[in-house]
């Protein structure tokens, strides 16, 4: 929770800094430079990468075994292998959101900045790789335990 509160504070500060810079450029009549900045995707792309990196880190902190447990639901030859430095890829991120209770494809699409159709396609593609029933797949993803739940269950059995 603290991580996301800090992240919100950082984003508010960045927004305020950006607002002040825009105001300064308007006051100085630097419209061309301002237009160039507004048309650039660099700030957006950097912010999105940071958001997804923070999401991936926080999610895997709560569900450290998620990738392994998710792969257990897939046929061995269809398991997801992450690239070096990658915490989650798009497929895993979609199902991480589902694990968190965000099931609506339009909400997932909005967060990941894809079309709803693309999210449907990813979901269908992954379900087709499953070694379990397609109908049960998402319910089984929702049952992947968090570290705190697993930790609590271990203490209950003692």
Description of each model-found segment:
Residues 150-157:
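Conserved small/polar residues in nucleotide/adenosyl-binding loops
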Residues 49, 53-149:
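Cytosolic nucleotide-binding catalytic cores of signal-transduction proteins
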Residues 1-86, 90:
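Membrane-proximal linker segments that couple transmembrane helices to downstream signaling/catalytic modules
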């Amino acid at each position: 929770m603290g991580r996301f509160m800090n992240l919100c504070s950082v984003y508010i500060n960045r927004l305020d800094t950006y607002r002040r810079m825009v105001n300064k450029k308007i006051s100085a009549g630097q419209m061309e430079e301002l237009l160039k900045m507004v048309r650039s995707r660099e700030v957006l792309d950097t912010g999105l990468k940071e958001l997804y990196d923070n999401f991936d880190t926080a999610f895997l902190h709560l569900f450290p075994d998620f990738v392994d447990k998710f792969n257990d639901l897939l046929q061995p030859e269809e398991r997801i292998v992450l690239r070096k430095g990658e915490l989650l890829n798009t497929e895993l991120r979609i199902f991480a959101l589902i694990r968190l209770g965000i099931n609506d494809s339009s909400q997932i699409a909005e967060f990941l900045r894809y079309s709803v159709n693309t999210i449907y396609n990813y979901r269908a593609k992954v379900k087709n790789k499953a070694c379990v029933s397609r109908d049960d797949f998402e319910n089984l993803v929702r049952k992947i335990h968090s570290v705190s739940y697993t930790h609590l269950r271990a203490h209950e059995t003692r």
